[in-house]
């Protein structure tokens, strides 16, 4: 890793045991080819494009940051967290675009608790599994865009969107890598703890400020979010706040034991959110990994 990247990450409060900001990792797949190191620069310009597409009978909104360059570029498809929207982790998205990497950010059907959501659907109709289908459809649409390099499609997700990203990656092919921010692997366990009896689940209830419906519970009640992580064939980089009390760091540590090719970066003095400064710095590192290989 270049000195500039290391300095940025040190400023971000990321713990490191070996100078690569890795706190835990499985064995890595050996490199078979040696490519010239690409120096990441984030001074490029980009164009914002908007899209709509259908998924599960609903019209969904997506926004893309597209670098102003010739030819096809790597593409990152972003999945937001519970109640958020396409603007979630926006500085990560912008930083990637300025580094020459396109970002396609969808708003899930019923996924936003905004008073003016951009996608159709009610929050009470949304679940992790409906979002998995939305993401599958987004991958199909986005990977065929004229500026996207189909051999360099990456997935990125925050919180519930991180869980959705991992579950989706278990079922799709040709994904080059995953970047997950405090992924909600603990969600099914939390649901079972909150509702010991499935037949006593209410029709609607409030979860972290978002009104959700019974389908949200029933769709993941029997899920083991960790069970198939060992089937992921692409590298995974997880970022998780040390002081996260919504999705504890232990959830990602548990996931690391199942993942074959993964890296966990622990963020000091960080809870269940990233500051704009952290987002920009993490976007810089993700760009470095996309250009120079996930470590």
Range-by-range predicted roles:
Residues 34-69:
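N-terminal cap/lid segment of alpha/beta-hydrolase-fold proteins
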Residues 73, 79-84:
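Active-site glycine-rich loops that stabilize anionic/oxyanionic intermediates
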Residues 124-146:
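Alpha/beta-hydrolase active-site loop
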Residues 167-213:
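Hydrolase active-site cap/lid region
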Residues 232-233, 238-240, 244:
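Short beta-strand/loop motif that positions the catalytic acidic residue
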Residues 270-281:
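Catalytic histidine-centered segment of alpha/beta-hydrolase-like enzymes
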């Amino acid at each position: 890793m270049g000195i500039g990247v290391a300095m940025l990450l040190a400023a971000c409060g990321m713990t490191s045991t070996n100078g690569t900001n890795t706190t835990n990792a499985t064995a890595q797949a050996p490199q078979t080819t040696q490519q010239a190191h690409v120096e990441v620069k984030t001074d490029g310009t980009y164009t914002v494009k908007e899209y709509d597409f259908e998924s599960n009978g609903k019209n969904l909104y997506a926004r893309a940051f597209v670098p102003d360059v010739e030819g096809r570029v790597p593409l990152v498809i972003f999945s937001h967290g519970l109640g958020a929207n396409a603007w979630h982790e926006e500085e990560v998205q912008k930083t990637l675009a300025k580094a020459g990497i396109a970002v396609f950010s969808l708003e899930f059907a019923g996924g936003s608790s905004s008073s003016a959501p951009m996608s159709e659907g009610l929050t009470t109709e949304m679940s992790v599994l409906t979002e998995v289908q939305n993401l599958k459809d987004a991958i199909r649409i986005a990977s065929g865009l004229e500026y996207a390099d189909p051999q360099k499609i990456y997935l990125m997700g925050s919180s519930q969107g991180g869980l959705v990203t991992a579950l989706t990656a278990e079922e799709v092919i040709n994904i080059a890598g995953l970047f997950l921010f405090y992924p909600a692997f603990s969600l099914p366990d939390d649901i079972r703890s909150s509702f010991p009896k499935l037949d006593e689940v209410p029709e609607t209830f409030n979860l972290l400020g978002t009104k959700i419906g019974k389908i949200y519970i029933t769709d993941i009640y029997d899920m083991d979010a960790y069970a198939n992580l060992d089937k992921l064939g692409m590298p995974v980089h997880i970022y998780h706040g040390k002081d996260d009390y919504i999705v504890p760091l232990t959830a990602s540590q548990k996931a690391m034991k199942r993942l074959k090719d993964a890296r966990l970066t622990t963020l000091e003095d960080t809870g269940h959110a990233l500051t704009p400064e952290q987002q920009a710095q993490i976007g810089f590192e993700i760009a470095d990994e996309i250009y120079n290989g996930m470590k």
